[in-house]
Design a protein with these regions (language model features):
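Glycine-rich phosphate-binding loops of nucleotide-dependent enzymes
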Residues: 2-312
């Protein structure tokens, strides 16, 4: 087993040696899913045979509008349930060796797998600090004995506040500590949601479009925070449609289309895959998704806007 935090060069060398095919086994998978299907009426939103997420890496989950990325996130984190399919094995997935197939969203989060949402969930009528404290594990009120013994709950509450203030400084939100969360900008709410997710010291964080609605001034800050998470040993799985971001920070890329995993590999290889480009651009599969000339076209801007509507 590899020691953590990872050395990125060693990680990329390890991943580069893999067979870049859908469902490939990882050297040290923290999350593995099998036979996960979700149908809505006659439409199949997710149909994943097998996929693994490498521990300690930044993995991007990409795909065109309606690919099933957010639905897959919802299934893995207990916000939705798979559809039983006759003649197929029952859906199963495990996190850090523990089965999560029938685990509630609350228990998933307490087990170390935290997610954020494309539309931020900041509690607007609470202060920034209060929002942070909600994300803390082992709240004093969760244990009757601790709640009745003041020295115990006071100590835990003080530790939670110290942790929250540390994270607010790290995310440069400390000046907003006592402000109402509803007064934050869209980008600041993204930072708050990511910071709050770290209150419970997760082993893995799942980010659903972390850059959606973020102005360029905060984009670089978010990128640096995501890379710092990886450098500290936290596994990151994120949905994103900014191909430059995907190429810049990802160690591994998984591609979904029509609910299925159609490709996996290193970012530079996936971006040049004709199957992946075809999934985004149809017949225009002579283009590299990471090229400036492609990203700046009206076609890509239109596709990105359509993709952002996926979970609205």
């Amino acid at each position: 087993m590899t020691s953590y935090p990872y050395d990125r060069a060693a990680l990329r060398t390890s991943l580069a040696a893999l067979d870049q095919t859908p469902g490939v086994s990882k050297p040290d998978a923290i999350l593995a899913a099998d036979d996960v299907v979700r149908r809505f009426g006659g439409m199949t939103a997710v149909d994943v045979d097998h996929v693994e997420i490498q521990r300690g890496a930044i993995t991007a989950l990409i795909g065109p509008n309606g690919a099933g990325k957010t639905t897959f996130f919802n299934l893995l984190t207990g916000f939705d349930r798979p559809t039983p399919v006759s003649g197929r094995d029952r859906a199963s997935w495990s996190f850090d060796g523990r089965s999560f197939s029938r685990t509630s969203a609350t228990k998933v989060a307490r087990s170390g797998m935290i997610r954020t949402f494309q539309l931020t969930k900041a509690l607007t009528r609470m202060t920034v600090l209060e929002n942070m404290l909600i994300g803390a594990a082992n709240q004093p009120g969760e244990n009757l004995f601790v709640g009745l013994v003041k020295p115990l709950w006071a100590k835990r509450e003080r530790e939670n506040v110290e942790r929250a203030e540390e994270l607010l400084r790290r995310f440069k939100l400390d000046a907003k500590r006592d402000d109402m969360a509803g007064g934050l900008s869209g980008g600041q709410k993204k930072l708050l949601e990511m910071a709050r997710a770290l209150m419970s010291n997760p082993s893995m964080i799942m980010l659903d479009e972390p850059m959606a609605g973020v102005n360029p001034a905060l984009t670089q800050s978010l990128l640096e925070h995501i890379e710092t998470l990886r450098d500290e040993g936290t596994t990151v799985l994120f949905v994103e449609h900014d191909m430059h971001m995907v190429r810049h920070i990802s160690d591994w890329v998984i591609v979904m289309a029509q609910g299925k995993i159609i490709a996996e590999g290193l970012p530079e290889d996936v971006m040049n895959s004709s199957a992946v480009i075809d999934a985004y651009l149809g017949a225009h599969h002579d283009r590299d998704l990471g090229d400036d000339d492609v990203i700046n076209t009206e076609m890509i801007r239109t596709i990105e806007e359509q993709v952002r509507e996926e979970t609205r």
